[in-house]
């Protein structure tokens, strides 16, 4: 479970988040939608320790992780798949996945069966299985996105943050990525999804939050938000 209380964060003197409150239950897929510049990516960066919150609490399994360095947050079980994919381009697909399990291999996370989880990733992402020895930098954009997601999953995270997984992808690859997210949901992976395609995000999610100018403007079950006239007009391309 991830609980956010009164989160304020920004960059230097520019405050982006103004007292954010959110809750993600175990096994739940929650989406955060909003226009560009609303503060969605900043939210994920604050949760994962990429930027330090100014105030507020971030409770991961009951422990306040606000202000911890990102590596410490990762060890506590929060994995972040950031926008832009950011794979290790000079490493193979298989080695990228092993890097995702690094906290487990060094004893800072429960080790479990890393090899079995590698096989599980290759089953979940069959295209990656076909490219195990290939350098990550030579993969297509869609394949790199799948690799970034799979690498984050190799942590065996308690919570997975996904930032714009469809960014820059063709419609066909967007469909593949969302099909994969659907399979992760079926596996009861706890996820917070930030996504530019609000309709697709609300279709797959259990619950949603709508962000405007660093504040939450609406929240509710995803189906309810999909049917809300104001949300449809603002984010789903539908008229009142």
What are these regions (language model features)?
Residues 33-35:
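The feature captures the beta-strand-to-loop junction immediately N-terminal to the Walker
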């Amino acid at each position: 479970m991830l609980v956010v209380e009164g989160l304020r964060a920004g960059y230097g003197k520019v405050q982006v988040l103004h007292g954010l409150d959110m809750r993600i239950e175990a096994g739940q897929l929650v989406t955060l939608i909003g226009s560009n510049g609303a503060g969605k990516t900043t939210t994920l960066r604050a949760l994962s320790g990429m930027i330090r919150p100014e105030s507020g609490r971030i409770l991961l399994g009951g422990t306040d992780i606000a202000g911890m360095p990102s590596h410490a947050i990762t060890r506590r079980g929060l994995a972040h798949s950031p926008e832009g994919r950011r794979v290790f381009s000079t490493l193979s697909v298989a080695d990228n996945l092993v890097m995702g399990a690094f906290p487990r291999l060094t004893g800072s996370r429960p080790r479990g069966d890393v090899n079995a989880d590698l096989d599980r990733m290759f089953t979940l992402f069959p295209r990656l299985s076909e490219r195990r020895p290939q350098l990550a930098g030579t993969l297509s954009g869609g394949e790199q996105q799948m690799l970034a997601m799979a690498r984050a999953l190799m942590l065996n995270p308690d919570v997975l943050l996904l930032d714009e997984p469809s960014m820059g992808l063709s419609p066909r690859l967007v469909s593949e990525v969302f099909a994969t997210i659907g399979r992760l949901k079926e596996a009861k992976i706890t996820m917070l999804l930030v996504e530019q395609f609000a309709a697709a995000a609300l279709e797959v999610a259990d619950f949603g939050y709508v962000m405007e100018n660093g504040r939450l403007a609406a929240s509710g079950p995803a189906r309810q938000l999909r049917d809300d006239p104001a949300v449809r007009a603002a984010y789903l391309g539908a008229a009142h």
